[in-house]
A protein has these predicted regions:
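C-terminal, non-catalytic tails of nucleotide-sugar-dependent glycosyltransferases
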Residues: 163-177
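Acidic donor-binding segment of Leloir-type glycosyltransferases
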Residues: 1-4
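DNA-recognition element of transcription regulators
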Residues: 122
């Protein structure tokens, strides 16, 4: 086990720093708040191996999936952002803001991810799709968190995510700072 101490601040910064330290074929984003089921990891790994898939995104909105942590505001926001992601970027995933993700490490590093905040949630799949990588969703069951508090401000972070999506749509280099 390697323990990393985050150098800068921000959700996206922590994830990017972690991905950049991974030396295995695949990486996985797995929250420490107890809301993810580790039993779903094998399913995600099998999808990567069996389907020539590059990234598997856990989804709380597929048949056989659920969320015990969503509020009506986060549900509506996520559905809206997932719709935007699928309509404008043809992502083909059903839960864009849920960062239970497993994917090809080198391909993730090649994306040159920049988002230091929650915009990371949309930057990863959008840049992956723009690079021609294959994305799929896998049913996931989100449990109530056992530790920690949500740091997401639905409206402030939602606006920031929307701005990030607009930048990713209009700017070819997709630079997000």
């Amino acid at each position: 086990i390697i323990i990393l101490y985050q150098k800068n601040k921000g959700y996206g910064d922590a994830l990017i720093e972690g991905i950049n330290k991974v030396n295995t074929e695949f990486f996985c984003i797995f929250n420490a708040d107890g809301s993810f089921l580790s039993s779903e990891l094998k399913i995600m790994h099998n999808l990567l191996n069996d389907n020539s898939t590059d990234f598997v995104f856990g989804s709380r909105y597929m048949l056989g999936a659920s969320s015990e942590d969503d509020t009506i505001v986060t549900l509506i926001g996520n559905k809206l952002f997932s719709f935007i992601g699928n309509f404008f970027f043809f992502l083909g995933i059903s839960d864009i803001l849920y960062t239970y993700v497993m994917g090809n490490t080198q391909k993730a590093k090649d994306l040159n991810l920049k988002s230091k905040d929650f915009a990371f949630c949309v930057e990863l799949p959008i840049k992956a799709k723009k690079m021609g990588y294959r994305l799929i969703s896998s049913p996931s069951n989100e449990k109530p968190r056992i530790a920690g508090k949500k740091k997401v401000n639905a409206f402030k972070d939602g606006l920031m995510i929307l701005i990030a999506m607009i930048k990713l749509f209009f700017f070819k280099k997709s630079i997000i700072k």
